[in-house]
């Protein structure tokens, strides 16, 4: 059995203590409540303070939870609300398209897959929740880069690797792709990330009309394309799914 790291256990206990009871606690209160020496408690508090998880009141010297915890908590709630709102619609999209469906959000310099619906057949498939995809070559990544200014900056700053001979890497060409994405309301990846694989994605917006994620389908090129072009009924299905999730998030009509 793996051994727990004592300092992390103590830090977690400290955060739980600050989250309950009085709004602010002094060093002595924290140390005595957790059975720690003052020096040990102070060292942990100082580290948590440096990371933004704990704040110290200048006047009283007492400690309280910091803004970084609020930011992390808000991110957690946003992602889980997005996934919850998308469950029914992504299942419908998988059934109507016959392809696998991915729901992605911006995470650092890539796309984090937060929901994955298998292609509705008997083929062997691997669950990809928690996987990362590049911003510059995938349909999900292009959508986020086109609509989210933060994702756009991350995509431009990242190392845009050429996965195939179709991958767009040059900044000017990439910007042109994003212009096209915004103009038509969806993004495509036809063998730009994986040989023989194509994907279509569209943006999801929240009640503030801010981009919060992207939804898309992925499958073999011969199934998603016809005579060298994306099948329009699949593009429409993806866009309809994105609009439906956006409406459920309070975005209104799109």
Curated annotation (Swiss-Prot):
GO terms for molecular function: DNA binding; DNA-binding transcription factor activity. Keywords: Activator, DNA-binding, Glycerol metabolism, Transcription, Transcription regulation. Residues 27-46 bind DNA. Signal peptide: none annotated. Residues 5-67 form the HTH iclR-type domain. It comes from the Bacteria. This is Glycerol operon regulatory protein. The gene is gylR.
